[in-house]
Design a protein with these regions (language model features):
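N-terminal, polar/charged subdomain of small-to-medium soluble alpha/beta proteins
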Residues: 1-95, 102-114
């Protein structure tokens, strides 16, 4: 099945990402959603926003990470994996990293999300 990864400047649409890994052969859809929080132990005061930037090769790196994870945990290629990391100015509550996985069974879906 397919796996893709992106670096995005636009807000991440969780509904679209979940739909992209849903299908008639998938009995499980799992996700990881990382969002901007309002505190950081190393920050002075309340966090109200973050600015994410990335290395020029970040797109290639995220693709390689997702590919290597799929090869390691799903060598038969049975799952669909989507990963998006947002860059730019993000407010508290904005989605920063989303990984969605669709597979026949939940164990593989959760394993790929955790990896």
């Amino acid at each position: 099945m397919a796996h893709t990864a992106w670096i995005a400047t636009d807000p991440i649409d969780l509904t679209d990402m979940l739909a992209s890994v849903s299908g008639p052969t998938h009995g499980a859809v799992a996700s990881f959603v990382g969002q901007v929080r309002d505190h950081d132990p190393e920050a002075t005061g309340e966090v109200v926003a973050l600015r994410y930037t990335c290395h020029p090769d970040a797109q290639r790196f995220i693709e390689e990470i997702v590919s290597a994870t799929v090869v390691r945990h799903d060598p038969q290629g049975l799952a669909e994996v989507q990963a998006t990391h947002r860059i730019g100015d993000l407010d508290v509550g904005d989605l920063a990293l989303v990984v969605t996985v669709g597979s026949a069974h939940r164990d593989l879906a959760f394993t790929l999300c955790r990896a």
